[in-house]
Amino acid sequence: MPPPARQRILDAALRLIQQKGIGRATTREIAMAAGAAEGSLFKNFGDKMGLLTELLSYELPENQAWRAVATEAPPGHGDLAAGLVLFMERAIVYYAAALPLTAGSFADRELLHRHQAINRERGTGPQLALQGAVDWLRGWQQAGHLDQQADLYAMAVALCGGALICAYSEQLAGPGQIRGGRDGLIHSLIDTVAGPHMTNSADADPHLRTQAASDRRAQG
C-alpha cells in the first residue's frame, strides 16, 4: 500500500529542493513527482514554503534523529557526557542537511519574508531546537547532573551554535578546517560549556567523558 499523499509530497519536496533549491522547485513539479494533485499540496501545506517549514521543523529525517536523543539518552539514565556527545553529533548532521534547503530562501527576499511569516504563524523556526535542548538539559539538571546555577538557555545556544558553525564550515571549506576536527570541537565545547556545571564525578572528569563517548561509539 503506497504511503499517504501527504507523506509522498513531503518526500518528493525534499528530493526536489535538494536537487534544485527552494526557488526553482515548483509546486507543480513536486506534486507530479509525488503522484498527487497540486491541490493536495496546497490543502496540506499552503505552499512550497509551508512544505519547507514542515520539513525543517518536523519531518527531515536528520531532525527526527536529533530529537530522538531525548529518548535515546534520557535525563538521569547513563551519563550526561555520552548524551552530550550524541546530541552534538546529531545536531551537526541536522544542520548539514538543513543548510542547503534554506539557502534559496536567504537568496530571495520574497521567499525569506514568506518563510518568516509562516514561522510566526505556526510557532516554528530554529528556536524549537533551542527549546528542545533546554528541556533536555533541564531534565539532567533535575536528575542532579548539572548544578542549579547553570544557564541552560545559554548552554543550549552554545552547543547548537557550535554544531551549526561546524556544519557550515564543513560544507563551505571542507572537512578538517575546524581545529581538532569535528570530534575535537564536540569534546572541547562540552568541556568548556557544560563541564564546569557537571556535578556527577564521571561526567565532570574530562578523561572519563572521552572514554564514555568512545564506549558508546563501540557499542553503536
Residues covered by each model-derived region:
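N-terminal intrinsically disordered/low-complexity leader segments
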Residues: M1-P4, M198-G220
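Short, structured helix-loop boundary elements
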Residues: R6, T27, M49, H77, ...
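Helix-turn-helix
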Residues: R8, R15-Y58
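Short, charged helix-capping/linker segments at alpha-helix termini
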Residues: G23-R24, H145-A150
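Amphipathic alpha-helical linker/stalk segments
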Residues: S57-F87
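Amphipathic alpha-helical packing segments from all-alpha helical-bundle domains
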Residues: A82, A96-G104, L112-A143, Y153-V157, ...
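Helix-loop "lid/cap" segments that line or gate small-molecule binding pockets
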Residues: L86-A96, A103-L111, L189-V193
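Amphipathic C-terminal alpha-helical segment
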Residues: V93-A97, V134-D135, G139-Q141, A156-Q177, ...
